[in-house]
Curated annotation (Swiss-Prot):
The name this protein goes by in its record: Ribulose bisphosphate carboxylase small subunit
Domain of life: Eukaryota
GO molecular function terms listed in the Swiss-Prot or TrEMBL record: ribulose-bisphosphate carboxylase activity
More about this protein: In this alga, in contrast to plants, the small subunit is encoded in the chloroplast. The basic functional RuBisCO is composed of a large chain homodimer in a 'head-to-tail' conformation. In form I RuBisCO this homodimer is arranged in a barrel-like tetramer with the small subunits forming a tetrameric 'cap' on each end of the 'barrel'.
Subunit-structure text: Heterohexadecamer of 8 large and 8 small subunits.
Functional note: RuBisCO catalyzes two reactions: the carboxylation of D-ribulose 1,5-bisphosphate, the primary event in carbon dioxide fixation, as well as the oxidative fragmentation of the pentose substrate in the photorespiration process. Both reactions occur simultaneously and in competition at the same active site. Although the small subunit is not catalytic it is essential for maximal activity.
Any one GO CC term of the record: chloroplast
Length: 138
């Protein structure tokens, strides 16, 4: 099951040239850009691991592409995404986020039902990937 989070999530995977154009767009807007990765793809997992530090005041997309390549090399079977933050209003608001790397096999999610007091049923989804320990999920 293909994970659909962020901008461009329903499109085919972006090429490196397309990623560079998106990163260059963020740089031209003077947005801070960060690279994050995770092996827990749950939609509510908003705390991905940060690769290095966010890059502020970068003038050229090649520095960001270097960080992306380094992250891909170190974490080839992880989800990796690029985030761009706009602080012009005095807050760090994410204005662009897209996945740039995926594991070869995306196992998907299962629905878990739990009966609670009063015969109410609670539903939650869990990724099949989290059945394995962190760091060895893919």
């Amino acid at each position: 099951m293909r994970l659909t989070q962020g901008t461009f999530s329903f499109l085919p995977d972006l090429t490196d040239a397309q990623i560079q154009k998106q990163v260059q767009y963020a740089v031209s807007k003077k947005w801070a850009v960060s690279v994050e990765y995770t092996d827990d793809p749950h939609p509510r997992n908003s705390f991905w691991e940060l690769w290095g530090l966010p890059l502020f005041d970068v003038k050229d997309a090649s520095a960001l592409m270097y960080e992306i390549a380094a992250c891909r090399k170190a974490k080839p079977n992880y989800y990796i995404k690029v985030n761009a933050f706009d602080n012009t209003r005095g807050v760090e608001s994410c204005c662009l986020s897209f996945i740039i790397n995926r594991p070869i096999n995306e196992p998907g999610f299962h629905l878990e039902r739990q009966e609670v007091q009063g015969r109410n049923i609670l539903y939650t989804i869990k990724s099949y990937a989290v059945n394995k320990p962190e760091g060895s999920r893919y």
